[in-house]
UniProtKB/Swiss-Prot annotation:
<feature type="transmembrane region" description="Helical; Name=7">
    <location>
        <begin position="277"/>
        <end position="296"/>
    </location>
</feature>
<dbReference type="GO" id="GO:0004992">
    <property type="term" value="F:platelet activating factor receptor activity"/>
</dbReference>
<keyword id="KW-0812">Transmembrane</keyword>
<feature type="topological domain" description="Cytoplasmic">
    <location>
        <begin position="39"/>
        <end position="54"/>
    </location>
</feature>
<dbReference type="GO" id="GO:0005886">
    <property type="term" value="C:plasma membrane"/>
</dbReference>
<feature type="disulfide bond">
    <location>
        <begin position="90"/>
        <end position="173"/>
    </location>
</feature>
<dbReference type="Pfam" id="PF00001">
    <property type="entry name" value="7tm_1"/>
</dbReference>
<feature type="transmembrane region" description="Helical; Name=5">
    <location>
        <begin position="185"/>
        <end position="205"/>
    </location>
</feature>
<comment type="subunit">
    <text>Interacts with ARRB1.</text>
</comment>
<feature type="transmembrane region" description="Helical; Name=2">
    <location>
        <begin position="55"/>
        <end position="74"/>
    </location>
</feature>
<keyword id="KW-0635">Pregnancy</keyword>
<feature type="glycosylation site" description="N-linked (GlcNAc...) asparagine">
    <location>
        <position position="169"/>
    </location>
</feature>
<keyword id="KW-1003">Cell membrane</keyword>
<feature type="glycosylation site" description="N-linked (GlcNAc...) asparagine">
    <location>
        <position position="4"/>
    </location>
</feature>
<keyword id="KW-0675">Receptor</keyword>
<feature type="topological domain" description="Extracellular">
    <location>
        <begin position="75"/>
        <end position="91"/>
    </location>
</feature>
<dbReference type="InterPro" id="IPR017452">
    <property type="entry name" value="GPCR_Rhodpsn_7TM"/>
</dbReference>
């Protein structure tokens, strides 16, 4: 099929959706991930980090990298898709978007494999010294993905095009593909198929974990609680993948074909609308990832529970004090004025 060069689609609802949605994700994500780092720094000396905690800290750092660029995207979409900031910030935002997406996928994958080993080979896993392996795997993930993302620093990321009224030109950020570009199509095919390969591995590992946990005989109540938390962790990881990453990668390849001009106009508009929604879903991983930590580490969960309990008790005390003060005032109203004089 020959590429169609004559039409440019736009999904105008995104200029309302993204500023609102990204603002919510930014606030919740910064609070949640900053709290995670603070708890880890307070509860765990760095030398005592095991493999799973190393992966969790790295996943949090990847989320924060993306979160710091969200204000840039909020400004961009608030200005109707016109990049008014310096050009290098567009490159930086695109780079951090790529890093967050695929570092999150990679670290969730190694976290899943770690839990898979712990369930299927508990004795060997308990005896293994995994700290060095955790550091090495994290380093490999960062070097590989940051190296791939460096392409976005040298890419010509912006392009000028007329606004919707045709009265002036606006600057787009990462919204232009050369029509019929085979290298661009090849890159996207590689990314999409690599993602689904990793997703199938994660799905297999989690299904094995679920089957193993459900077929185990629970002897004591404590083991039942551990089993319940493990099942919740598996469900949470799968939920993050299915909600955040799968929709985006299902749409990505058809959307790329449409952007390159290999699809008709009606399909292009429909897939572009869907693509905007999947970008929103993709950003929610920064908020959902911290939930996984509650099921992975006992200290983290205990600390969070204590803080929530403390806040609830503080509100009760505050309310009780307020009610007591009101009662005292009401009682004083019934006391004769003369009796209050010395």
């Amino acid at each position: 099929m020959e590429p169609n060069n004559s039409f440019r689609v736009d999904s105008e609802f995104r200029y309302t959706l993204f500023p609102i949605f990204y603002s919510i994700v930014f606030v919740l994500g910064v609070i949640a991930n900053s709290y995670v780092l603070w708890v880890f720094a307070r509860l765990y000396p760095s030398k005592k980090f095991n493999e799973i905690k190393i992966f969790m800290v790295n996943l949090t750092m990847a989320d924060l990298l993306f979160l710091v660029t969200l204000p840039l995207w909020i400004v961009y979409y608030y200005n109707q898709g016109d990049w008014i900031l310096p050009k290098f910030l567009c490159n930086l935002a695109g780079c951090f978007f790529f890093i967050n997406t695929y570092c999150s996928v990679a670290f969730l994958a190694v976290i899943t494999y770690n839990r898979f080993q712990a369930v299927t080979r508990p004795i060997k896993t308990a005896q293994a010294t995994t700290r060095k392996r955790g550091i090495l795997l994290s380093l490999i993930i960062w070097v590989s993905i940051v190296g791939a993302a460096s392409y976005f620093f040298v890419l010509d990321s912006t392009n000028r095009e007329p606004n919707k009224t045709g009265s002036a030109n606006i600057t787009r950020c990462f919204e232009h593909y050369e029509k019929g570009s085979i290298p661009v199509l090849t890159i996207h095919i590689f990314l999409v198929f690599s993602f689904f390969l990793v997703f199938l591995i994660i799905l297999f590992c989690n299904l094995v974990i679920i089957r193993t946990l459900l077929t185990q005989q629970v002897q004591i109540q404590r083991n039942a609680e551990v089993k319940r938390r493990a099942l919740w962790m598996v469900c949470t990881v799968l939920a993050v993948f299915i909600i955040c990453f799968v929709p985006h990668h299902l749409v990505q390849l058809p959307w790329t074909l449409a952007e390159l001009g290999f699809q008709d106009t009606d399909f292009h508009q429909a897939i572009n609308d869907a693509h905007q929604v999947t970008l929103c879903l993709l950003s929610t991983n920064c908020v959902l990832d911290p939930i996984i930590y509650c099921f992975l580490t006992k200290k983290f969960r205990k600390h969070l529970t204590e803080k929530l309990y403390s806040m609830r008790e503080s509100r009760k005390c505050s309310r009780a004090t307020s009610e007591t003060g009101t009662e005292v005032v009401m009682q004083l109203k019934d006391v004769p004025v003369k009796s209050l004089k010395y």
